[in-house]
């Protein structure tokens, strides 16, 4: 009986070996490997798409943050320079006040009128100063093309080269932005 058991065990082992080597099993193994390779390709493809999508998402987030920052800066600039158009409109009237105040008063009534104009002029300047408007200094300063507009050149030994000799029209700045440059005569 032991012999018979040994024989049955050997037959089972041979059957298992034959089963493992049969063409059907080898096809299944190839199919499993092919299926595994296809699944791996699909995983790799999905990983690439995920990486691309993550990159695109990060770029969109960065673009949105830049947009928010730009909008905030534009809003701050609009708030900072909100009075620019009003100031630009008032400057010619201010110039006319200054020209009118240069007239010499001969009688008391004219002197009184000039005093009233000077008070209004001073109040206008104070209101503009509160908004951040300042007069651009010109005479005796070095010519700065950002703040001055040269309309004449002269040679004057009393002034340095490239210095402003005379101012024909005052220039104004609103905070750090030039509203109107000074019209000046510059030494060569």
Swiss-Prot record:
Keyword Protein transport: no
Biological process per Gene Ontology, one example term: protein folding
InterPro entries from the UniProt entry: GrpE (IPR000740), GrpE_coiled_coil (IPR013805), GrpE_head (IPR009012)
Gene3D superfamilies xref list: 3.90.20.20, Head domain of nucleotide exchange factor GrpE
Chain spans, region Disordered: 1-31
Subcellular location as annotated: Cytoplasm
GO molecular function: adenyl-nucleotide exchange factor activity; protein homodimerization activity; protein-folding chaperone binding; unfolded protein binding
One Pfam family this sequence matches: GrpE
PROSITE patterns: GRPE
Top-rank taxon, per record: Bacteria
Compositionally biased tracts (Basic and acidic residues): 1-16
Predominant localisation class: cytoplasm
Record key words, sorted: Chaperone, Cytoplasm, Stress response
Gene Ontology CC terms, in alphabetical order: cytoplasm
Keyword Kinase among UniProt keywords: no
Subunit structure: Homodimer.
Family note: Belongs to the GrpE family.
HAMAP family referenced in this protein's UniProt entry, alphabetically: GrpE
Biological role: Participates actively in the response to hyperosmotic and heat shock by preventing the aggregation of stress-denatured proteins, in association with DnaK and GrpE. It is the nucleotide exchange factor for DnaK and may function as a thermosensor. Unfolded proteins bind initially to DnaJ; upon interaction with the DnaJ-bound protein, DnaK hydrolyzes its bound ATP, resulting in the formation of a stable complex. GrpE releases ADP from DnaK; ATP binding to DnaK triggers the release of the substrate protein, thus completing the reaction cycle.
The protein's name in its UniProt record: Protein GrpE
Organism field: Bacillus cereus (strain ATCC 14579 / DSM 31 / CCUG 7414 / JCM 2152 / NBRC 15305 / NCIMB 9373 / NCTC 2599 / NRRL B-3711)
Lineage: Bacteria, Bacillati, Bacillota, Bacilli, Bacillales
């Amino acid at each position: 009986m032991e012999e018979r058991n040994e024989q049955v065990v050997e037959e089972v082992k041979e059957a298992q070996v034959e089963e493992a080597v049969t063409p059907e099993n080898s096809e299944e193994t190839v199919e499993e490997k092919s299926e595994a390779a296809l699944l791996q390709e699909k995983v790799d493809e999905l990983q690439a798409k995920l990486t691309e999508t993550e990159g695109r998402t990060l770029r969109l987030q960065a673009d949105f943050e830049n947009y928010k920052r730009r909008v905030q800066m534009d809003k701050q600039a609009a708030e900072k320079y909100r009075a620019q158009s009003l100031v630009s409109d008032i400057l010619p009237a201010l110039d006319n006040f200054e020209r009118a105040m240069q007239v010499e008063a001969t009688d008391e009534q004219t002197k009184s009128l000039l005093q009233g104009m000077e008070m209004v002029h001073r109040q206008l300047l104070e209101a503009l100063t509160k908004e951040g408007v300042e007069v651009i200094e010109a005479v005796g300063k070095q010519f700065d093309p950002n703040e001055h507009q040269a309309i004449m050149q002269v040679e004057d030994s009393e002034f340095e080269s490239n210095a402003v000799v005379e101012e024909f029209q005052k220039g104004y700045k609103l905070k750090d932005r030039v509203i109107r440059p000074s019209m000046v005569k510059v030494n060569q």
